[in-house]
């Protein structure tokens, strides 16, 4: 009995120690160091920062398409999962930044138009992946959850982005938006 308890304690200790390690491995930063630097450099420029998040999310989907079309790709299912996860993390960060700028009452109408266009593009690419007929079921099961989650998030967000743009247009008519976000880009072409 005592040996069994001792054994159980050791197993539990090992599981608890391994848990944070495996969790850290799953939640890596989807941004490269140069991308992090670019984001940091635009921290007070909503228009530029939001454009960067769209650009980075788009790059993950482009990389996904390239990887999936390459016949030499090894471990396609895992790479698909990881790129979709990176896309989801970047897209969530985009939405978090939108929320921040809305809370500050910044005028983000121009980047919202870009984001709405990107939403349509992202929806099409994610649906094409979901509807791909030539993918074995075993492969699909590896990334099906993250794909469904990403598609649901983009669908919901696209609707919210359109509503937010309408709200921003209305607020601009009543001059309720801060134009301070425009001062950094004043005189610069967009």
Where are these regions (language model features)?
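Long, charged/polar, soluble alpha-helical segments
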Residues: 24-190
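N-terminal secretory signal peptides that target proteins for export/translocation
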Residues: 1-5
